[in-house]
């Protein structure tokens, strides 16, 4: 499955537009991770714990979106957008949206 943020792919033509596909994930945080993140914020470092959680959530939503596109008969998803939101005090939501398409190489 080819995934792209752009609306077109060089060397390919879209032969079928199959619809909008999404992937969603809501991840909970925990006390220890929050504590470590706040310490990193105070001393100006990066929060590896949160970065790892963001990467995990991003992988989940992209895989979920790919599976939904595959069920529609797509071999690519174009125009992908990723959104990140905090939900309440201790939850992180990641949403991926794109267009499922069937592509073929240009001749």
UniProtKB/Swiss-Prot annotation:
InterPro entries: UPF0145_dom_sf (IPR035439), UPF0145_YbjQ-like (IPR002765). It comes from the Bacteria. Belongs to the UPF0145 family. This is UPF0145 protein CHY_0465. It comes from Carboxydothermus hydrogenoformans (strain ATCC BAA-161 / DSM 6008 / Z-2901).
């Amino acid at each position: 499955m080819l995934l792209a943020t752009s609306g077109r792919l060089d060397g390919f033509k879209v032969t079928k537009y199959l619809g909008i596909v999404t992937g969603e994930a809501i991840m909970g945080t925990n006390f220890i991770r929050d504590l470590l993140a706040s310490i990193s914020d105070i001393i100006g470092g990066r929060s590896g714990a949160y970065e790892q959680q963001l990467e995990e959530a991003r992988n989940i939503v992209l895989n979920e979106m790919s599976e939904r596109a595959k069920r529609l008969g797509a071999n690519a998803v174009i125009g992908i957008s990723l959104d990140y939101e905090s939900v309440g005090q201790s939850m992180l939501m990641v949403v991926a949206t794109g267009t499922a398409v069937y592509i073929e190489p240009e001749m």
